[in-house]
Regions:
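PRPP-associated nucleotide enzymes
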Residues: 1-259
Length: 259
């Protein structure tokens, strides 16, 4: 609802601007045309609350995603409308790629914009949330793909060597060297690559992914400062050990938790 309130506030300012530009010279029809503009909101995707793919085990997650949503037809203008969908976060991108985008594309939009209220989730959590494997994160997959695209895959090897070197350190001396994976790229470059990765083959609509940035997230919730899965700045030394170990597991194709 916050997004709709914000867009409506913008639209009211736009209406005011257009009316002022008329300098008092307007007809009733013209005024009505300006005032009648509104934001279209529809419940297009209806979620089955009994199904939750995020907490499903890896083996069964993929087969569940196709059964989570149903849609409403006859609302979207074919090859004209842009659909803006809001997600609280994008962790793996599994549901987007295997379910949501395929379903929404059948409605015929020209473009689908996915807006994540959370920043890019780049690092594992080790304080209670089930996000422990680097290779699962779509943001990490995007960064690795960008290294391959740009001929900088050697940096992945360098980060691995640094992780191995620190693995025997006392945890108080370990630093999060996995940050280097993301450093060469802007947030926009990673977001664009994520859009490529989550777009299923065969869909017609253009796909755009927009993430909340970390600075604005802190501005929105100043009393909640835990951001390590976005920033990599862990509040305890053990967090750095976990992220480096998670990268070692990824590099060695070891499919297990880092803690």
């Amino acid at each position: 609802m916050g997004l709709i309130e914000g867009v409506n506030a913008w639209l009211n300012r736009e209406k005011q601007r257009q009316i002022l530009q008329l300098n008092g010279e307007f007809s009733e029809t013209r005024l009505q045309s300006i005032l009648s503009r509104k934001i279209r909101t529809e419940k297009l995707a209806i979620k089955d609350v009994k199904l939750r793919t995020f907490i499903t085990d890896d083996l069964h997650r993929d087969e569940m995603v196709a059964h989570v949503y149903d849609v409403t037809y006859g609302v979207v203008k074919d090859n004209i409308d842009t659909l803006v969908i809001v997600d609280d976060s994008i962790v793996r991108g599994t549901t987007l790629k295997q379910s949501i985008l395929k379903i929404l594309d059948r409605l015929g939009p020209k473009r689908i914009v996915i807006v994540s209220s959370a920043p890019q989730i780049r690092y594992p959590d080790c304080y209670g949330i089930d996000m422990a494997k680097m290779g699962d994160f779509i943001a990490f997959q995007a960064a690795i793909a960008l290294h391959k695209d740009n001929g900088t895959a050697y940096m992945v090897d360098e980060v691995y060597e640094q992780c191995i070197a620190q693995d025997s350190y006392p945890k108080e001396e370990i630093r999060n060297v996995v940050k280097r994976i993301y450093e060469p790229f802007t947030e926009q470059e990673i977001s664009d690559k994520i859009a490529e990765l989550v777009k299923p083959k065969g869909i017609k609509a253009e796909v755009v992914v927009i993430f909340q940035n970390l600075e604005d997230l802190h501005h929105a919730i100043p009393n909640h400062t835990g951001d390590w899965y976005f920033s990599g700045n862990y509040p305890t030394p053990g967090g750095n050990k976990v992220v480096n170990r998670a990268f070692i597991n990824y590099y060695n194709k070891v499919n297990e938790r880092a803690y």
